[in-house]
Curated annotation (Swiss-Prot):
Xref: Gene3D superfamilies: Adenylosuccinate Synthetase, subunit A, domain 1, Adenylosuccinate Synthetase, subunit A, domain 2, Adenylosuccinate Synthetase, subunit A, domain 3
Binding annotation for GTP: 12-18, 40-42, 304, 330-332, 412-414
Catalytic activity, reaction form: IMP + L-aspartate + GTP = N(6)-(1,2-dicarboxyethyl)-AMP + GDP + phosphate + 2 H(+)
Gene: purA
Keywords noted in UniProt: Cytoplasm, GTP-binding, Ligase, Magnesium, Metal-binding, Nucleotide-binding, Purine biosynthesis
The protein's required cofactors: Mg(2+)
Family membership: Belongs to the adenylosuccinate synthetase family.
Keyword Membrane attached: no
Name of the protein this chain belongs to: Adenylosuccinate synthetase
Source organism: Leifsonia xyli subsp. xyli (strain CTCB07)
Top EC group: ligase
Cited PANTHER family: ADENYLOSUCCINATE SYNTHETASE (PTHR11846:SF0)
Matching CDD domains: AdSS (cd03108)
Length: 438
């Protein structure tokens, strides 16, 4: 059976949790393969709203096995806060599995993250300060702490001691902060071990066996393509691989097992933190999108930057990920706008660019070239078929589909889990290349 990857196709906060939830009743496993608790998603179930930061959204669907795979960095305090919060609300969390190879965020990672960002001043990246980047840096530098290390105190103590030799030198000599004690870190990590033990598995083997047994496996990407460490707007990116390729390396399955890649795009664009954003709005329309779309970070609560839909970005992310289907979210946010601008290309120093410039400098100087489309005033939250949408909303969707590099297979028309229009089956046979790129 297929492995399906869901990817954010802009700068994050596109509504991936809702798309995952849409597929949940037909999915057996939901896998988080990158990132940590630096990106949140909100899932609405009936009258209940759940804000998740680390746990896969599949944990809210009965019968689904949620998996935190090896590509994730895990803050154990956040993990158990989220689990305990769900347990208190009657959610069964006993199915959760965590890779023994996932890396652990410690107190010193969070400290380094925060003081480094302050030290950078105007050059700061805009991190969430949750220790994600420093944990991935330790992973690459081969001094990281993995989940499996918590079950051997001698190994854990040796690894933490080696890491603190460097971290404390940096904190004391460069940042003028106090040193962090070895026992403080080791005791904290060991306190989680026994509760964690029943959840820990070889996630690569688990997922391989699931696919061999004909199970449906959904890979849920954190952050988004334009924040990918290789393919995003570097250096204003996250520290992990947030494209479809990261699903294979971040979980231990072969790339040939991936059958479909579903890209999630808002009907407009948002971004959090620093970095280029060609369609960003600084006027009343930017505030309109922010207030109407509730564009405030699930993790940080900070206001998101807002702008119009960017078709070159969608084409770029379709190409980088091999997107077979797009899910267009928050179309309802645009209701009431008389003329809706869409960025169709960029002007860079008087030269038209139909695609995202490869040069970082060019992209920083890119000015959007807009085409406008007529809007609609009707409430679309009750639409369940494409034909139920106002003609102008249908035309807007068709226009985005033509410009974006893959078919739009579902459309979000409201915040609730059932407020969605499904045009094409997202679990059945994948579209042909001609259909996917039309």
């Amino acid at each position: 059976m297929p492995a399906i990857v869901i990817i954010g196709a802009q700068w994050g906060d596109e509504g991936k949790g809702k798309a995952t939830d849409l597929l949940g009743s037909r999915i057996d496993y939901v896998v988080k393969f990158n990132g940590g608790n630096n990106a949140g998603h909100t899932v609405v179930v009936g009258d209940e709203k759940y804000a998740l930061h680390l746990l896969p959204s599949g944990i809210l669907t009965g019968g689904v096995t949620p998996v935190i795979a090896n590509g994730v960095v895990v803050d154990l305090d956040v993990l158990f806060q989220e689990l305990d919060g769900l347990i208190a609300r009657g959610v069964d969390v006993s199915r959760l599995k965590i890779s023994s190879n996932a890396h652990v965020i410690t107190h010193y990672h969070r400290t380094i993250d925060k003081v480094t960002e302050r030290f950078l001043g105007k050059r700061q990246i805009g991190t969430t300060g949750r220790g994600i980047g420093p944990t991935y840096a330790d992973k690459i530098n081969r001094v990281g702490i993995r989940i499996q290390d918590l079950f051997d105190e001698n190994i854990l103590r040796q690894k933490v001691e080696g890491a603190l030799d460097q971290k404390n030198h940096l904190l004391v000599k460069v940042y003028n902060r106090r040193a962090i004690g070895l026992d403080e870190i080791v005791d904290d990590l060991l306190s989680y071990a026994e509760r964690l033990r029943p959840m820990v598995v070889d996630s690569s083997l688990l997922l391989h066996q699931a696919l061999e047994d004909g199970k449906y496996v959904l890979f849920e990407g954190g952050q988004a393509t334009m924040l990918d460490v290789d393919h995003g707007t570097y250096p204003f990116v996250t520290s992990s691989s947030s494209t479809s390729g990261g699903a294979a390396t971040g979980s231990g399955i072969g790339p040939n097992r991936i059958d479909r890649v579903i890209g999630i795009v808002k009907a407009y664009t948002t971004r959090v933190g620093s970095g280029p954003f060609p369609t960003e709005l600084f006027d009343e329309w930017g505030e309109f999108l922010r207030e109407r779309g509730f564009e405030f970070g699930t993790t940080t609560g900070r206001p998101r930057r807002t702008g119009w839909y960017d078709a070159p970005i969608a084409r770029y992310t379709a190409r980088v990920n091999g997107v077979t289907d797009f899910v267009l979210t928050k179309l309802d946010t645009l209701t009431g706008i008389e003329r809706i601008p869409v960025c169709v290309a960029y002007d860079v120093d008087g030269v038209r660019h139909d695609e995202v410039p490869a040069s970082q400098s060019d992209f920083h100087h890119a000015k959007p070239i807009y085409e406008e489309f007529p809007g609609w005033t009707e409430d679309i939250s009750g639409a369940r078929r494409f034909e139920d949408l106002p003609k102008n909303a249908q035309d807007y969707t068709h226009a985005l589909e033509r410009m974006s590099g893959a078919r739009i297979s579902a459309i979000g028309v409201g915040p609730a889990r059932d407020e969605i229009v499904v045009r094409h089956d997202l679990v059945g046979e994948a579209p042909s290349p001609a259909d996917a790129s039309r």
